Amino acid sequence: MAFHALEKLMFLEDGYRREFVINGIPLLLLQEGGRPQLIRNQCPHRGQPLTHGDVSNGVIRCPGHGWSFNLSDGQCRLPGPGPCLTRYALIYEGTQIGVDL
């Protein structure tokens, strides 16, 4: 595994979203409620990118079929129990935030 810097901390604010591809993995870095989150940029239901999904109250909704997932733990909220959203632990290094992949 290697550290991959994603963004400078000073640029993160609620509403922030940015796509990355690292080692062939599509990622989405976003911030909501003062907390940055890094998720796989792919709905586990049908594989659609989540870049333009609605985010509110700690939940992201897939723009394709409306499935919703908790950002805090990846659990499927709607339509009910289902495949989980893949989340990645963020690492703070100096003035940057990144991930080990």
Feature-to-residue mapping (PLM):
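N-terminal pre-ligand scaffold of iron-sulfur
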Residues: M1-N57, L71, C84-L101
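Short cysteine clusters
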Residues: C43, C62-H65
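Short cysteine/histidine-rich metal-coordination sites, predominantly Zn2+-binding motifs
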Residues: N57-P63, C76-L85
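Short helix-to-coil "ATP-lid" hinge immediately C-terminal to the conserved N-box Asn in the Bergerat
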Residues: S68
